[in-house]
Structure formats: C-alpha cells, structure tokens
Amino acid sequence: MALQRTHVLLLLLLLTLLGLGLVQPSYGQDRMYQRFLRQHVDPDATGGNDAYCNLMMQRRKMTSHYCKRFNTFIHEDIWNIRSICSTSNIQCKNGQMNCHEGVVKVTDCRETGSSRAPNCRYRAMASTRRVVIACEGNPEVPVHFDK
C-alpha cells in the first residue's frame, strides 16, 4: 500500500514538473508581449507633442527610477501591429532572425538630457515610418521594438 502511494506521488510530481516546463515559455512570451504593449502601443492617440511624451512616459512607468532616453509609441490598432509579424523575417540588431518590418504612425520620444527622474522631460517627433519589431510564439506576437 505504501509503495503504491509513493508511485502515485512520484507520478503526480513528474506531471507537475512536466506541466511547469510546458507553461513557462508561453508565460515568459506573454510577459514580453504585455511589456511591448505597455511600452510601445497607443492606438487611440495621434501623439506628436512634448506634453504627450511627458505624460505617456510617466503613465507607462518609464520614468520611475531613471529617465528612459528614447521610446517609440505606435499609433496603430494592435492587429495591424501583429500583422507585421507575418511579413518576411529580417535580421535584428542583435543578429537574431526573428525581426519583421512595416510602416506605421509613430511618436518618438527623446529625453531632453537635462531632466531627472521622476520628472523626466521629452521632445516629441511624430511621423509615419518604417519600424522593425521582433516577434515570437505561435502565433507570432511582437515582443521587442528593434528600431
């Protein structure tokens, strides 16, 4: 009886560990996707001015401990952004081949160089331009803004 109980416990432990191994990668990818959304996606705005950058950088928690020097907000529907992941693979800045490019409306926010966290100040530049994003998963989702 004790031997049978031990086998059942070992089997449950094995299944639990196996399950954790399968869940972790998708959880990590989901975290990276959520971070990408928080840092780079603002579909309802047109952006384009310094006040927008100052507010959004603070609101999206990129000025808490230090002033993030540069960030880009994409002003497109998330499905339009995700569709970039279905374009041909190109090489990322880090050498990996999981990047894709597309043309989108953006606001680039550049730190002025004279501010200190949490009161960071930014200069805005709105444009429609080519962007490169890294995508991962199945289906692929954006996880990193490359350039």
Curated annotation (Swiss-Prot):
It is an enzyme of class 3 (hydrolase). The active site is at H40 (proton acceptor), H144 (proton donor). GO terms for molecular function: endonuclease activity; nucleic acid binding; RNA nuclease activity. The gene is RNASE4. The modification Pyrrolidone carboxylic acid is found at Q29. Cleaves preferentially after uridine bases. Has antimicrobial activity against uropathogenic E.coli (UPEC). Probably contributes to urinary tract sterility. Keywords: Antibiotic, Antimicrobial, Disulfide bond, Endonuclease, Hydrolase, Nuclease, Pyrrolidone carboxylic acid, Secreted, Signal. Belongs to the pancreatic ribonuclease family. It is found in: Secreted. It holds the Pfam family RnaseA. This is Ribonuclease 4. Its EC number is 3.1.27.-. One of its GO terms (biological process) is defense response to Gram-positive bacterium. The keyword Signal applies. Disulfide bonds join C53-C109, C67-C120, C85-C135, C92-C99. DUMP binds at R35, H40, K68, N71, T72, F145. One of its GO terms (cellular component) is extracellular space. Residues 1-28 form the signal peptide.
